[in-house]
Regions:
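Hydrophobic, membrane-inserted alpha-helices
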Residues: 36-41
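Transmembrane helix recognition focused on a "late"/terminal membrane span
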Residues: 2-33, 56-151
Length: 151
């Protein structure tokens, strides 16, 4: 059995001087990042990752619309309630807002549901939040591709 030699690859997250990622100007990744927030997948399209962009667009938009069809509740920031309720409402609001234009258009067109008891409405609320959280992950991916930390 041959002796194993240590790998010559650097550990993930560490770079030698010769393999450090190049300095990328903010303008190179900020536009795709904002586009990725407004329209899910648009940042990937701008960075020429069309397959990934299409998959993200379909995933986030369908998840958001399933949440709407199930009459899920969109969170609004509430203060004055107990700490846990405020934390949940603010967290849900940030997740909903992260869906970008989907959330903005649904709010502009007057979509609002009262919080009702029932499993379907509860699942709808979870779908609306999940759409925003998926878009946050897509935005992180856009930033990593834009700064050339990932292909």
């Amino acid at each position: 059995m041959a002796a194993q030699t240590p790998s010559t690859r650097p550990e993930p997250g560490t770079y030698s001087v010769s393999s450090a990622p190049p300095d990328i100007p903010v303008a190179a990744w900020l536009g795709p990042l904002v586009a990725a927030w407004i329209i899910p997948g648009a940042g990937h399209f701008l960075l020429k990752k069309t397959g990934r962009g299409a998959l993200i667009f379909v995933s986030v938009v369908s998840t958001f619309f399933f949440g709407l069809f199930m009459r899920g509740v969109m969170f609004t920031p509430e203060s004055g309630a107990d700490y846990l309720t405020s934390l949940i409402n603010y967290g849900g609001f940030v997740a909903n807002l992260s869906a970008g234009a989907l959330y903005i258009m649904a709010s502009m067109f007057g979509y609002s549901q009262i919080d009702m008891a029932g499993a379907v409405h509860d699942y709808g609320t979870k779908f609306l939040v999940t759409a925003g959280l998926l878009n946050i992950l897509a935005m992180v991916d856009t930033w990593e591709i834009g700064t050339r930390r990932k292909d």
